[in-house]
């Protein structure tokens, strides 16, 4: 805690510094922050505020709360994931989605605690009066509050899935979906929740994107999102046109593959080729992250397989088919074996 305002916010780049000022003015209009009039009574925590560019190209102000976050204990909590959403979806159903604008700013900060969330810009002291981005407990707080909305609408028969400010509602038919969509928008309005009409999909659909996947409830399929595959293919193209890449780049490639392999049939098997090559030729405890490794023909052949998946995507079943056979296998340094029915 400091009696004197410290950590002034500012960029040497004049254009970026102007963007910071514009975002602070915007937060003032949204009543997310407030000016602390001087002289400054009592103590406060002062931090730097910076901008993070969103996928839309717009800017999000984030306060650097690393020091405060070290003192916070965030309880464990359940939040929707791609797995829970996937398991909840039913082929043939419809969905619509709601995206909230400035989600965290819907949660007010207790007046006595706002002094812990201060920053200085051009000699003026500000403090957050709404939940800021950058606080480690923010996802937990926001989810706990919005879970009450979820419980309320479940009583009304609305199947709502929450992933922070991205909401997905599943319904059995189109007409019911239009009614529930209108109900949810009206409810958000009554609760003071701002709906982002540009990013929301309020018309019931059977083909939609949510979190990391492209879902097709009509044909019982799930595909990777186009932008995620494009990012992966850009890295693959670099490897295909190179003779050597660093171990760090190999790990980045494998990480991108791992994020998409659940959406692509046999992807985990094909990922094993570059993964095995890295394990055989590099030791993370001994070798540098920047050591150069070759990109041999068999690795490039495996990468071409991934490239073909983007040209002709097959996806994976939303609901897997019933199994007709069970095969049990085991292996050791001395041998291997398999068992299926009466066959061994």
Where are these regions (language model features)?
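Reverse-transcribing Pol proteins
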Residues: 1-77, 124, 161-166, 264-300
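C-terminal reverse transcriptase regions that engage the nucleic-acid substrate
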Residues: 73, 127, 202-318
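Catalytic palm active-site di-aspartate
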Residues: 64, 99-101, 134, 155-174, ...
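Active-site palm subdomain of RNA-directed nucleic acid polymerases
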Residues: 37, 139-188
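Reverse-transcriptase-like RNA-dependent polymerase core
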Residues: 1-4, 52-60, 101-126, 142-151, ...
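Conserved catalytic palm subdomain of right-hand nucleotidyl-transferase polymerases, strongest
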Residues: 56-69, 85-109, 249-252, 327-329
């Amino acid at each position: 805690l400091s009696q004197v305002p410290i950590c002034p916010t500012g960029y040497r780049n004049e254009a970026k510094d102007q963007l910071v000022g514009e975002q602070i003015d915007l937060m003032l209009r949204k009543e997310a922050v407030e000016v602390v009039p001087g002289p400054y009574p009592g103590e406060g925590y002062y931090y730097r505020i910076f901008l993070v560019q969103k996928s839309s190209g717009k800017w999000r102000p984030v306060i650097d709360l690393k020091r405060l976050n070290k003192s916070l204990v965030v309880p464990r909590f359940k939040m929707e994931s791609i797995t829970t959403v996937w398991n909840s979806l039913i082929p043939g159903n419809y969905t619509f989605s709601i995206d909230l604008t400035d989600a965290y700013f819907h949660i007010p900060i207790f007046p006595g605690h706002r002094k812990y969330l201060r920053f200085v810009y051009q000699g003026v002291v500000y403090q957050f009066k709404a939940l800021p981005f950058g606080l480690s407990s923010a996802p937990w707080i926001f989810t706990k509050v919005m879970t009450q909305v979820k419980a309320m609408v479940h009583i009304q028969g609305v199947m709502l899935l929450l992933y922070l400010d991205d909401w997905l509602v599943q319904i059995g038919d189109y007409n019911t979906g239009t009614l529930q969509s209108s109900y949810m928008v009206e409810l958000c309005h009554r609760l003071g929740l701002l709906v982002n009409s540009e990013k929301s999909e309020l018309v019931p659909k059977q083909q939609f994107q949510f979190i990391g996947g492209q879902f097709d409830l009509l044909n019982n399929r799930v595909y990777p999102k186009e932008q995620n595959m494009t990012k992966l293919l850009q890295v693959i193209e670099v490897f295909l046109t190179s003779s050597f890449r660093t171990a760090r780049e190999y790990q980045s490639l494998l990480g991108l593959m791992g994020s998409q392999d659940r959406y692509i049939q046999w992807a985990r098997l094909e990922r094993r080729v570059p993964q095995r090559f890295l394990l055989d030729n590099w030791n993370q405890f001994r070798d540098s992250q920047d050591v150069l490794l070759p990109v041999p023909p068999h690795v490039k052949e495996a990468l071409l397989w991934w490239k073909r998946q983007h040209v002709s995507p097959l996806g994976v079943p939303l609901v897997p088919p019933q199994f007709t056979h069970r095969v049990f296998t085991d292996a050791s340094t001395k041998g291997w074996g398999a068992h299926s029915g009466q066959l061994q």
